[in-house]
């Protein structure tokens, strides 16, 4: 299929002040059900017998100036309230959160990502990197994960003694945690291939897992019409502390391209490099 958008549906017709007609609908980016459904708008024209059809040769709408949306995903957790980019998973529990000295402390719940407390933000890119500084309390397990639902997630969590790497809900591996209860975790999702890293200072990183396939963690396999979102996780006892959460588009910029010149390519649909 050459179409850049799949599973188009639930269209709504609207007209503008100039008498032009449009259809607003949702769809999945080709090959990226994990990003969830996007909202799109497309011009239509009316036929002589009163039906409508999309305009196949439509010209893309060009804004007069580049507009950046105002929702920044990175967060320094200065409080006193949670940022609008965050949402709880199947609960609303603001009393489980405490802000202190630029650290978000989140009370634990459950034992694993399937029943633990998860705070989510929606990734915007097909190639992105996210990281956070984590502090685990006594009896606490905390981490940074990609989360679709209770049956579909991947990432890294730790109790301060061992790192637990989830490739999915059914597949978990363990590695010694030589850093301790205070560590940094970083995830790089490039085209639904996930890499997991940890660090003691946020500068030098150790790769725990790479090239993990997360392309199947979406609605067609697990239902729900969600997206595979970035999650902060706290389970066990006490609370976990999170600080300096960062999210960025990981597509190399022009100034960084010297090392990529031999492999750079342009993907008209959804570029990753």
Summary of predicted features, one role per range:
Residues 34-37:
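Short, solvent-exposed loop/turn segments at conserved positions within beta-propeller repeat blades
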Residues 26-28:
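Short loop/turn segments immediately following the C-termini of beta-strands
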Residues 14-16, 47:
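Structural WD40 beta-propeller signal
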Residues 3, 30-31:
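Short strand->helix junction
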Residues 30, 42, 48-273:
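Extracellular glycan-recognition regions
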Residues 19-23, 51-52:
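Entry beta-strands of beta-propeller and related beta-repeat scaffolds
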Residues 17-18, 64:
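Long, internal scaffold/assembly segments composed of regular secondary structure
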Residues 1-14, 211-221:
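Conserved blade-ending motifs and adjacent loop-strand segments that build the rim/top face
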């Amino acid at each position: 299929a050459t179409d850049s958008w799949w599973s188009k549906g639930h269209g709504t017709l609207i007209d503008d002040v100039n008498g032009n007609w449009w259809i607003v609908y949702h769809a999945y980016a080709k090959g990226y059900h994990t990003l969830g459904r996007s909202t799109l708008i497309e011009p239509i024209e009316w036929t002589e017998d009163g039906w409508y059809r999309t305009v196949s040769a439509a010209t893309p709408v060009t804004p007069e100036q580049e507009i950046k949306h105002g929702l920044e995903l990175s967060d320094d957790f200065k409080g006193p309230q949670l940022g609008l980019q965050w949402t709880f998973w199947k609960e609303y529990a603001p009393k489980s959160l405490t802000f202190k000295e630029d650290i978000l402390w989140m009370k634990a719940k459950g034992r694993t990502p399937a029943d633990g407390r998860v705070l989510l933000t929606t990734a915007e890119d097909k190639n992105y990197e996210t990281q956070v500084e984590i502090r685990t309390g006594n009896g606490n397990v905390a981490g940074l994960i990609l989360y679709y639902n209770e049956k579909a997630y991947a990432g890294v969590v730790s109790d301060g003694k061992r790192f637990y790497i989830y490739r999915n809900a059914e597949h978990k591996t363990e590695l010694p945690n030589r850093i301790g209860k205070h560590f940094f975790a970083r995830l790089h999702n490039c085209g639904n291939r996930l890499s997991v890293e940890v660090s003691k200072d946020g500068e030098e990183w150790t790769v725990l897992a790479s090239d993990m396939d997360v392309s199947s963690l979406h609605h067609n396999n697990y239902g729900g019409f969600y997206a595979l979102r970035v999650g902060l996780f706290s389970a066990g006892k006490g609370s976990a502390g999170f600080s300096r959460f960062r999210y960025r588009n990981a597509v190399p910029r022009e100034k960084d391209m010297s090392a990529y010149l031999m492999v750079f390519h342009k993907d008209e649909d959804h570029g990753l490099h």
